[in-house]
Each structure stands twice: as C-alpha cells, then as structure tokens.
From Swiss-Prot:
Catalytic activity: 2-deoxy-D-ribose 5-phosphate = D-glyceraldehyde 3-phosphate + acetaldehyde
Compartments reported by the entry: Cytoplasm
Superkingdom, taxonomy of origin: Bacteria
Protein name per the record: Deoxyribose-phosphate aldolase
PANTHER family registered for this protein in UniProt: DEOXYRIBOSE-PHOSPHATE ALDOLASE (PTHR10889:SF1)
InterPro entries documented for this protein: Aldolase_TIM (IPR013785), DeoC (IPR011343), DeoC/FbaB/LacD_aldolase (IPR002915), DeoC_typeI (IPR028581)
CDD domains: DeoC
Keywords, ordered alphabetically: Cytoplasm, Lyase, Schiff base
Active-site residues per Swiss-Prot or TrEMBL entry: D95 (proton donor/acceptor), K161 (schiff-base intermediate with acetaldehyde), K191 (proton donor/acceptor)
Major localization listed first in the record, in broad terms: cytoplasm
EC code(s) of this entry: 4.1.2.4
C-alpha cells in the first residue's frame, strides 16, 4: 500500500493483539469489544484465551492465536497439537514461531519440516509463520531471512510474519518487511508486528510491503492518522 490509508482501510489490516501472560478473561472481552468498535480484521490472543475471545465476539469475529510462542523451540508435534486445539476452540488463523535456532544454524530442512507438521495438522486454516526477522538479520544476514521466507512458502504458509514482539532483538522494521516482501513476491502475505506504536510506523511498514499489521496499540495508531 502506497500513501496514507484512511482510518477504515488501516483498521481492516490489523490483528488487534493481546498476548501478555497476565491478560485475564475480562481483558480479552475488552479487547474484543474494542476490536468491533474499531473495525479491525481480527484479534490475536494466547491459545488459552481463544474460547473467551470467540465467546466475547459471539462467533462473528476472526480470532487468531499463536503456536510455539514465543521461543519457537517447542517440539514440532507439540506445535501441531497446539494448533489443532486452537482451531477446535474457534481460532481461524494460526501464527506459529519457527525453530529460530535451526534457522540460524542453517538447518533449513528442520525449519521446513516444523512448518509442514503444523500446516498438515490444520489444512485450510490461515497459517502465518513468525521468523523473528530482527534475530535473523542481527545474528545472520539478509540471505538467511530470504531463505527462511522461501522455506515458509514451500511448506505451505499463507503469511510470513516479522516478529513475536517478545524478543529483545526487536520487532518489525522497514528493512525486514522490504526483504520479506521481495522474497515472497506477492505470493504470500507479509505481517509486520512488534513495536508498531504510531501511525507513522504503520504507514512506513505498509509502504514497505506489509499486508497485515499486528498491533497492541491499535487505537493510538488509528488516532494518529492525520
């Protein structure tokens, strides 16, 4: 997207997110109410909160959740079972974290098989693959980030996603989104998440190629549109 979107256009690209471990059912209900008010695309909550989000949204709101979060170092079958349970609870999209250590070690076969196990477990459900782009760019290089995106595509992902937002290396960046967009060439969506707190941040990432935004400060970002 080039140029400044309208408030409605930007909201329609947002996964309104609450992944803090201390979040309560009341917090999730408030998140859902705000999501409906703001007109966002979906909410994204922790796996244990999927039923609460579905109930609060009366089944009329898309609910995304996370798998292997936030480290990505869960055994693949555990990620797959977590995804299956989330979908059974009403999740419509799954954001899984890759085996980041395997990616840094150059073991792309392990990265691919990990994604494929989750993909096969939830066929037909939107799957976003979190690559922790700040880690890959900081500890490896641009080629590694591109290769991981190619692996995600080959494994059947629908999106590549920059970050969990919980790693000290950082969240989304224009550089990462640009590289990821180039790597998938419009064949997959690109979700930017982590540290997006202003309208300026959001617009820059959309201009770089992001097609979805993960925001916890959604109202503040939308209110920042001039």
């Amino acid at each position: 997207m080039q140029g400044q979107p309208t408030r409605k256009q930007l909201a329609a690209l947002v996964d309104h997110t609450l992944l803090k471990s201390e979040a309560t059912h009341a917090d999730v209900a408030a998140l859902v109410a705000e999501a409906v008010e703001l007109g966002v695309y979906a909410v994204c909550v922790s796996p244990s909160m999927v039923p609460a989000a579905v109930e609060a949204g009366a089944g009329g709101l898309r609910v995304a959740t996370v798998v292997g979060f936030p480290s990505g170092e869960h055994v693949s079958i555990v990620k797959a079972q977590e995804a299956v349970q989330a979908v059974a609870s009403g999740a419509t999209e799954i954001d899984m974290v890759i085996a980041v250590g395997a990616a840094l070690a150059g073991d792309l076969d392990a990265v691919r098989s990990d994604i494929e196990m989750v993909r096969s477990a939830i066929a037909g459900v939107v799957l976003k693959v979190i690559v922790e782009s700040a880690v890959l760019l900081g500890q490896a290089n641009e080629r590694t980030l591109a290769e991981v995106c190619h692996v995600a595509e080959a494994a059947g992902a629908d999106f590549v996603k920059t970050s969990t937002g919980f790693h000290p290396a950082g969240g989304a960046s224009v550089r990462a989104v640009t590289l990821m967009t180039e790597a998938v060439g419009g064949r997959l969506g690109v979700k930017a998440s982590g540290g997006i707190r202003t309208a300026v941040d959001a617009i820059a990432l959309l201009d770089a190629g992001a097609t979805r935004l993960g925001l916890s400060s959604t109202r503040e970002v939308l209110d920042g549109l001039s």
